[in-house]
Amino acid sequence: CAWPPGSAAPPPAAAETGVQVIAKDCFVTEDSIAIADEVPVVLTNPQLYEAPELLVEWYRERKRDLPWRHHVNAYRVWVSEIMLQQTRVEAVKPFFERFMTELPTVKDLAEAPEDKLLKLWEGLGYYNRVRNMQKAAQKIEEEYAGKFPENYEEIKALPGIGNYTAGAISSFAYGIPKPAVDGNVLRVVSRLLASDEDIMKASVRTKIENAIEPVIPEDAASD
């Protein structure tokens, strides 16, 4: 919404000092603000601006050697993130390596016979995950000429991909600073914000995503 002439505009350094206000669908006059829709307000703890540098340093010194962190591309990140849903890292490793050997590209996944696909997934469970992956791969082949999209919204529009996976692909594969918010991130950030809101609510997740996206270092988004 626009601030009328002569009225006090919000200070440009507000976000840096710990306040980020996000409003939508509102009308501002000299004497009042009329709100026509829900207004999410995020009070950003200054610690959120200090944490990324420390976390990046810690990660670079202690990161685990995982197969999907080698030869990084959007396809490999995507496959690993879908496999890691509801499944332990150690359990995923052999499945990931076998899957990459048998279906190394989006095209291979799009064209794989269903029996082969399900056999490769056998032991991971939740078979709809891999069925959605094939639908997404087919969409990439048809609409993007086989090239994995780089735009966050286009990635999120693929079957079986939500905010977290789209954020992970954007960050890890393309270096685009987008949040990948899972349960661990929700718990840590809610404590930094001194929030007692229910982190299981979609509105709270959105609030936390809005809070951390501006503080993701552009030069370390893939970390």
Q: Which residue stretches match the model-derived regions?
A:
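Catalytic cores of DNA base-excision repair glycosylases
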Residues: 35-49, 53-223
